[in-house]
Amino acid sequence: MSRLVVDVTGRGEPLVLVHGLATTGAIWRRVTPSLARSRSVASIDVPGFGGSDPAGRGFDLDAVAQRIREGLARAGVAEPYDLVGHSMGGALALTLAAAHPEAVRGLVLVSPAGLAPVPGALAAAVGRAAELYIPLRRYGAPLAGHPWGRRLLMTGGVIDGAALAPAEVRQLVCSSRGARRTREALVAVAAADLRAMLAELQRPVGAIIGSGDRVVRPGTLDTIRALRPDAACEAVADAGHISMIERPRRFVTALERVLVAIS
């Protein structure tokens, strides 16, 4: 039986958190304590990342989403749950919700991938570039002690990496060592077009994006609103792509607002 790491804390209605590329469920650690005051919060390591076994060869969104649902069930996470997905995790969360709407009460997309597809050749090129960048990030932990090093290591993730604590950046970088399916996942989500899936989803939808996000396209919130006029949308001020790390309090406030709006 394949292993899915599921870390559950708190009591209340179930809330599932799905992380993005090149990291693990630890990406949520700055917001989990606040969320767990009123919720049972389950953060996972996506199959092929952290301590979770891959879902077969490569990275198939449907297969990975299915493995996530099965692993949550084995861990005793009750359905239906509110499902939150960040970046790659947004594409996976949407895929899971579309395949198994009975398992999901509401869906929250945080700076989601899968809504602005790129051509397959470009996606493959991005994947090859990741093969160079990810090792640098994995073994660049000593650079976190310098402001310029934190900026380099967190390029694209936050507005100013130097503003993060060295220990925070070091932990994020080290978590990349367990991201075994990063290249395959990057190619899969870059080429994915899940817009029709989102438009047709028979579940309430919310979205959160950092005001300074440089990874997802600037018009992503507009795209979501066009596809889902009923979506509850929030922007996290002064935050980039990893808003839950850069502005944890603001992120929690935004997420709680969205969850109330879609409940």
Regions found by a protein language model. Name each.
Residues G85, G89, A93:
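Gly/Ala-rich beta-loop-alpha elbow adjacent to hydrolase catalytic centers
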Residues A98, R105-R138:
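Flexible "cap/lid" loop of the alpha/beta hydrolase fold
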